[in-house]
Amino acid sequence: MNKIIILLIILLSFDIISAAKKFGRKGIRTLGDNEVLLSDGAIRGTVTDTHRVFYGIPFARPPIDELRYEDPQPPKPWSYVRDGTKQRDQCIQDCKLGKGSCSEVGTSEDCLYLDVFIPRTVNPGSKVPVMVFIPGGAFTQGTGSCPLYDGLKFANSSVIVVNVNYRLGVLGFLCTGLLSGNFGFLDQVMALDWVQENIEVFGGDKNQVTIYGESAGAFSVAAHLSSEKSEGKFHRAILSSTPYTVGLKSQTVARGFAGRFSSKIGCDLEDIDCHRSKSPEEILAIQKELGLAIGDKILDAFTIWSPVVDGINVNEQPLTMIKQGTTHDVPTIIGDNQDEAILFVYMTYKNVVIPSSYRTMVHVLFGIANGNKVLEHYPLPGFLKDSRPILSKLLTDYLFRCPGRYHVSKSAQANESPIYHYQYKQVLSGGHSFEACEGLVCHGTELPMVFNTYESALDLDLEEEEEEFAEQLNNYFVNFIKYSNPSHPNGLPTPKVWNPTTKTTNTSLVMKLGFEVKDLITNDPKCDLFDSLSYNGYTKDQNRMRKSKK
């Protein structure tokens, strides 16, 4: 009897080895099943009639204790079947991003997990294109595990969606002489490594990976386009509402903010043990207190904490590399919303901004001579009238629209891969959670339409023509993810042909009901002015906080 048992064990071992060889180090346990075997262990997900989803897959070791303020480390293998039916905590933050944009399960330093949405019928040999979504939130808020970014719609269109988390704020970007300040960015790189290692288990094609980000997520995508660390780990890119002009932090600026933070929390800048002794609650409280000081660039207020240009992980400012033609040459979509800056201006200035204050802001931002040129295009309103509307238009152009146009123009000249541009102009019906955005197309307005989560995440009841618009919008993105062409003839139906901008054509797609195709580059004196001033090239006497004259 014992010999028979031993023989059965040996035969079973051969079967396991055979299966492992068939699928590499990993393989799906039963086709159509809810369990998969990853490189680090097995995980059980949820199966529905239309798709499968695996929540809370670890792509790095928890960055806690001695791993706080360290580059991400590979996860430890596990020997049990991990529960992937529930979302994990978002990274430490005080999320105020609005309905549907924050996690419903809490926060933790143990947050380096990703969620995978898969078409129901795929198997390990399907070679389905993959979209990795990097959420925004000024590098201090945001999570891939929220209702807004549910990947069901993409999965139903035969795209695998991977939503990632990464460390935020101080915990993600504290830069000292000893610390790079790029932990959050390297978390994203490790997530891309995980995709290369594991996505075939889910039926994905590791050679067809699109990275897609919005706002700070788009700036992250721009950094990946500029980083040797990310080369070859993605093959297409989508950047929505990229605040290029804000810039990533230089090491000098990043260390300045780190020094102030260290003083407030009671640690020497280089005393990492002291920093590791502080609770997440203490860190978050001091982080929220920290603002600009005399000598800081005004635009640093948008992202006090961000990836750092260190010459190793992030080689240079993305817009500088775009100008030089040295970014990774991959098919790209880039675009922005009609009223991007309204949200930021009205959240910062809750009361009327009088014209004299507006003029001072422009002069501080651009210097007096260049500021006067800017005021010719964005003139002062009437006496004592509110300047916030014109300030919003200026910042929409200067932070988002014009540098986006610059990116498209330079890449079309330097790269072989196609680049597509859009302008999103569809007002979100059913109201906006922020009063100043009512009837406008604010930052982030496109997201519930692209993901088709307007009902599930925002409880919006759209008109039939708006639902059709959202369907068509998603089709453009799906076609690009599959074919590098949003209007590919073999793709899903779209109402207009969206051609790339090239060395000789300047096409842009206006995203609103009916869609329109228009010229992007020419006849735009406002952007021409900002191009001539540059977006990151101000002297030390400009664009900085100053002491007010008595």
UniProtKB/Swiss-Prot annotation:
Gene Ontology terms for molecular function: carboxylic ester hydrolase activity; hydrolase activity, acting on ester bonds
Domain of life: Eukaryota
Sugar attachment sites: N156, N506
Catalytic residues as annotated in Swiss-Prot or TrEMBL: S215 (acyl-ester intermediate), E340 (charge relay system), H443 (charge relay system)
Signal sequence segment: 1-19
Keyword Cell inner membrane: no
Annotated InterPro entries: AB_hydrolase_fold, CarbesteraseB, Carboxylesterase_B_AS, Carboxylesterase_B_CS
Keywords, in A-Z order: Cytoplasmic vesicle, Disulfide bond, Glycoprotein, Hydrolase, Membrane, Serine esterase, Signal
GO biological process, one term: sorocarp development
Cellular component, GO annotation: early phagosome; esterosome membrane; extracellular matrix; lysosome
Subcellular location, record wording: Cytoplasmic vesicle, Esterosome membrane
Primary site of residence: membrane
Translocase among keywords: no
Disulfide bonds: C91-C111, C267-C274
Family: Belongs to the type-B carboxylesterase/lipase family.
Protein name stated in the entry: Crystal protein
Species name: Dictyostelium discoideum
